[in-house]
Swiss-Prot record:
Component of the PI(3,5)P2 regulatory complex at least composed of ATG18, SAC/FIG4, FAB1 and VAC14. The keyword Nuclease does not apply. The gene is SAC1. It is found in: Vacuole membrane; Golgi apparatus. It holds the Pfam family Syja_N. It comes from Arabidopsis thaliana (Mouse-ear cress). Phosphoinositide phosphatase which catalyzes the hydrolysis of phosphatidylinositol-3,5-bisphosphate (PtdIns(3,5)P2). Can also catalyze the hydrolysis of phosphatidylinositol 3-phosphate (PtdIns(3)P) and phosphatidylinositol 4-phosphate (PtdIns(4)P). Required for normal cell morphogenesis, cell wall synthesis, and actin organization. One of its GO terms (biological process) is cytoskeleton organization. This is Phosphatidylinositol-3-phosphatase SAC1. Its EC number is 3.1.3.64. The lineage of its organism: Eukaryota, Viridiplantae, Streptophyta, Embryophyta, Tracheophyta. One of its GO terms (cellular component) is Golgi apparatus. It is a peripheral membrane protein. It catalyses: a 1,2-diacyl-sn-glycero-3-phospho-(1D-myo-inositol-3-phosphate) + H2O = a 1,2-diacyl-sn-glycero-3-phospho-(1D-myo-inositol) + phosphate; a 1,2-diacyl-sn-glycero-3-phospho-(1D-myo-inositol-3,5-bisphosphate) + H2O = a 1,2-diacyl-sn-glycero-3-phospho-(1D-myo-inositol-3-phosphate) + phosphate; a 1,2-diacyl-sn-glycero-3-phospho-(1D-myo-inositol 4-phosphate) + H2O = a 1,2-diacyl-sn-glycero-3-phospho-(1D-myo-inositol) + phosphate. The keyword Membrane applies.
Length: 912
């Protein structure tokens, strides 16, 4: 039956506060959200018919098409049933038969925005979607297709609607590709962290004023006229990735959500530093969620941790140049009181609470000062702010020269960053739901950084000083090991008196930055995520220890997620995928292939920053509403700079930050209904007949079994990051005859094998060697003995003779007097082991087949072909742009030069 508008509007707000999705709309008719729409048109109006997921309740939105430059929207106050909406559409068709009747336009999944340029209004509609994840039973969607439709009828539009200026604005707005890295949810506030959603109450609808809602400006005309948010979608820009894992049969999901701020948003060289409102460029919040969907339970456990990245909060810039891939860095303005920097950190305290930990990864020493200029000024700014802040608001500043440490042979970047991450997590904590019944928790629980953690804070400051002085790797990691032992004892005592089932909350955040906040920052955020994941699994009872082996399969799965996130964020801000050498080395990829790919990324990023970022920045300013076209004013593309669009009092005032509140302050009425949906509800939910590709993402076949520790017995297929040689590099070298029958010294081979056997006898695993900060000799040895790759490869895959024969690799260099060799030789003397004893013809045929399948240098030839293809692509880009460097002219005379340099001069025949 039909229902009045007043009750419907209030009940939708109630539903939004509940957050828990309704499973039976018939028993709870007031709890619904509009998820599916159909757009119809007549000559005078658009009719947007929206329904809930189960198509039991329908609403109608009427959009007038008779005004060329006005937007007149009226919402029908009636809630219709399926029969009633069908009857209504028939009556509309009958009433408009004289003017063409009622025509179906498109199937729609929501309104992404409503834009006006010079005259006409346009509707931006989502016409195709796909589900990319699920948080606490709430579906998360990405956009596959979108469509822009003109609101006024073509017969009443003036010539302005078809002018060049109007068409160019329309094309510019359409260049913002909603199908890339935009996501939304109908029922879950994905723009807020899990902790914020749990602690929030009393909010009506989706918080469109949140800084991470990118279409806040575009949806404002519809939201203001309807006084609700049921017709529009709150789009978040960034990255979303979710995987389902299983540890010994216990299923859970790990979700990575990156949210890009719409304030001071833009491209790499056009948006740097901070603006007058304290907004920084490339401001991205990253949340890591772990949800335990254990079957049979009413409510599972959940945990999340938040970190963020952002440009250095100073007034600095770089100008893109066609002649310099690394432009000089300029400090545009000297602010003696660092007012904008102060506003930025106050905003972080408002968003995340205290403490704010700043991890600065830029260089300290350079031949030509670039990054070090910012490093000194940033340190001065933090020092000044700490002198005027109260002690509880002091910034924790850590500076570490990432590049300087990574260049050393014995560098273990992830180990150092992991130690810093552990310190940061001790100070900020993380969110854990605890037992579902325990919901009464006072705000005093949130004061994590009090007297009990002051020793850790002092160690953190001392550690920052050590890193800034550039201590050796052994000294730094030795200090980390000693402090880690002390932390373990303190943590054990703390855990004995702590109720592990009680809810925990995060207060404070780790803020990481380099110059671009892309490449180095992503490695540091992965190290933080890995340390946090161990604590999350431990809190949820999925692990016995709060640490995860860096060589484990679950660490590899998490690394893939952060690598995917880093590539997406780098593409948005920098124009290419992220530069990275740590992840490929850890994943065992061949160094030469990695170098060629990094080279192409540099070319692509250079091209994007030099030639396409200007138009991309204009599209962002138009989409976010920082520029609003007006008659008689200069067009967007005629402006010399967009600086005035983002200064105080113009751009940011469009979006008041009412919805941005500290996640560290609990409110009354905690949203206890926000919890994972039990697995049995997913198993028996009704699903329509659809394609296999869509269903496979939600079935159990997508669950990946992982381990919390490394599986050394299953190598070489596993990770070999601690051995000093990549698996695919070892495979290529082992296939070469020089490695199988080359001139390796017997004493070197025996010593290498013996060293591997000694480790096996002592029970020392590769993981323990990585965690042994005090002894890095094994790292330096692996670098010095590059010629013994074959023997070190065998030492990994072989077992000790004293441990038995199963799984052992018996080769020709074994001692003939050993018990195992005699046992093996005895089996070889059996008649069944001599297949060619009486058949010489079969023996010759078999030998010929072996010769045909002999592995030769074909792999090197394939690598040469791949390198030539990469270089040809680079040459094509350079020739199209006319920017081929002078020093690259000799490439044209020898196309194989790049491949020869990467693979080796002695392995590639020169082209004569």
């Amino acid at each position: 039956m039909a229902k009045s508008e007043n009750s419907t509007t209030s009940t939708f707000s109630s539903f939004a506060n509940k957050i828990q999705p309704s499973n039976d709309a018939e028993s709870d008719p007031d709890s619904y959200a509009l998820e599916k729409f159909k757009l119809y048109e007549t000559r005078a109006r658009f009719y947007l018919v929206g329904s809930d997921r189960n198509k039991r309740f329908f609403r109608v939105l009427k959009i007038d098409r008779s005004e060329p430059s006005e937007l007149n929207i009226s919402e029908d106050p009636v809630v219709y049933s399926p029969q009633e909406i069908k009857s209504l559409l028939q009556r509309i068709a009958e009433g408009n038969r004289a003017t063409g009747g009622l025509a179906f336009v498109a199937k729609v999944y929501g309104i992404a925005g409503c834009a006006k340029f010079m005259e006409s209004y346009y509707l931006v509609l989502v016409t195709k979607r796909r589900q990319i994840g699920c948080i606490c039973g709430h579906a998360i969607y990405a956009i596959d297709e979108s469509q822009m439709i003109s609101v006024p009828h073509a017969t009443i539009q003036s010539d302005v609607a078809n002018s060049k200026t109007e068409l160019r604005y329309k094309k510019l707005l359409s260049s913002v590709d909603l199908t890339k890295d935009f996501f939304y949810s109908y029922t879950y506030p994905i723009m807020q962290s899990l902790q914020k959603n749990v602690l929030s109450s009393g909010e009506e609808g989706m918080p469109y004023d949140n800084i991470f809602v990118w279409n806040s400006y575009l949806t404002q005309p519809i939201r203001s006229r309807c006084n609700n948010t049921i017709w529009t979608l709150a789009l978040v820009h960034g990255h979303f990735k979710q995987i389902r894992l299983s540890i010994y049969g216990r299923d859970f999901s790990v979700t990575l959500v990156s949210r890009r701020s719409r304030h001071f948003a833009g491209t790499r060289y056009l948006k740097r530093g901070v603006n007058d409102r304290g907004r920084v460029a490339n401001d991205v919040e990253t949340e890591q969620l772990v949800l335990d969907d254990e079957a049979g339970s009413c409510k599972g456990k959940m945990s999340s941790v938040v970190q963020m990245r952002g440009s250095i909060p100073l007034f600095w810039s770089q100008e893109a140049s066609r002649f310099s891939p690394k432009p000089d860095i300029f400090l545009q303005r000297y602010d003696p009181t660092y007012e904008s920097t102060k506003m930025h950190f106050e905003d972080l305290v408002n968003r995340y609470g205290n403490p704010i930990i700043v991890l600065n990864l830029i260089k300290t020493v350079e031949k030509r000062p670039r990054e070090m200029v910012l490093r000194r000024e940033f340190a001065n700014a933090v020092g000044y702010l700490n002198s005027i802040f109260r002690e509880e608001n002091h910034l924790k500043f850590i500076h570490w020269d990432f590049h300087k440490f990574a260049k050393s042979k014995s560098a273990n970047v992830l180990a150092v960053l992991g130690a810093v991450a552990s310190e940061a997590l001790d100070l900020t904590g993380l969110y854990f739901s605890g037992k579902p019944k325990i919901v009464k928790k006072k705000a005093s629980q949130l004061s994590h950084a009090n007297t009990a953690r002051e020793p850790s804070l002092r160690d953190l400051r001392a550690y920052s000083a050590e890193l800034s002085r550039g201590e050796s790797a052994n000294d730094i990691l030795s200090a980390l090991a000693n402090r880690e032992k002390e932390m373990k004892l303190t943590q054990q005592k703390k855990d004995e008196g702590t109720n592990s089932s009680a809810p925990r909350y995060q207060s404070g955040v780790l803020r990481t930055n380099c110059i671009d906040c892309l490449d180095r920052t992503n490695v540091a955020q992965y190290a933080y995520g890995l340390a946090a994941l161990g604590r999350q699994l431990h809190a949820m009872g999925l692990s016995d220890t709060p640490k995860i082996d860096p060589d484990s399969s679950i660490a590899a799965a998490l690394m893939d997620m952060y690598q995917s996130m880093g590539d997406a964020l780098a593409q948005q801000y920098g124009g290419s995928a992220a530069h990275n050498t740590v992840f490929p080395e850890r994943q065992g990829k061949w160094k030469a292939t990695t170098q060629s790919r990094e080279f192409l990324k540099s070319i692509k990023r250079y091209y994007s920053n030099t030639y396409t970022d200007g138009e991309k920045q204009d599209a962002i300013n138009l989409f976010l509403g920082y520029f609003q076209p007006q008659e008689g004013k200069p067009a967007l593309w005629e402006l010399d700079s967009d600086y005035y669009l983002h200064v105080s009092g113009i751009g940011d005032d469009i979006f008041p930050d009412i919805g941005v509140q500290s996640i560290a302050k609990p409110m009354s009425g905690i949203g206890v209904n926000l919890a994972p949906v039990p697995a049995f509800r997913d198993d028996f939910s009704r699903k329509k007949l659809t394609s296999f590709d869509k269903l496979i993402e939600q079935t159990c076949s997508s669950i990946k079994n992982v381990r919390l520790c490394s599986e050394t017995d299953q190598r070489p297929g596993g990770n070999t990051g601690s051995t000093g040689v990549a698996p695919d590099a070892a495979e290529i070298q082992l296939k070469s005859p020089n490695w199988l029958f080359g001139s390796r010294k017997p004493e070197e081979s025996s010593s290498a094998t013996k060293s591997g056997a000694d480790d096996s006898e002592k029970g020392v695993t590769s993981t323990e060697r990585v965690n042994d900060f005090c002894n890095l000799d094994w790292l330096s040895k692996s670098d010095r003995h590059q010629g013994d790759i074959f023997q070190r490869y065998l030492s990994i895959t072989s077992t000790n003779e004293a441990n038995g024969w199963y799984g052992g690799t018996l080769l020709g260099d074994q001692d003939e007097n050993s018990e195992i060799y005699r046992h093996y030789a005895q089996f070889c003397q059996c008649p069944a082991m001599e297949p060619f004893e009486n058949d010489h013809e079969f023996e010759q045929n078999f030998a010929e087949v072996l010769r045909m399948n002999t592995i030769d240098v074909m792999d090197i030839e394939e690598e040469e072909t791949e390198m030539e293809s990469d270089f040809n692509e680079y040459t094509q880009i350079g020739s199209d742009l006319g920017i081929i460097p002078m020093q690259c002219k000799h490439f044209a005379s020898d196309p194989c030069w790049l491949a020869r340099w990467l693979v080796g001069d002695d392995k590639v025949p020169k082209v004569i």
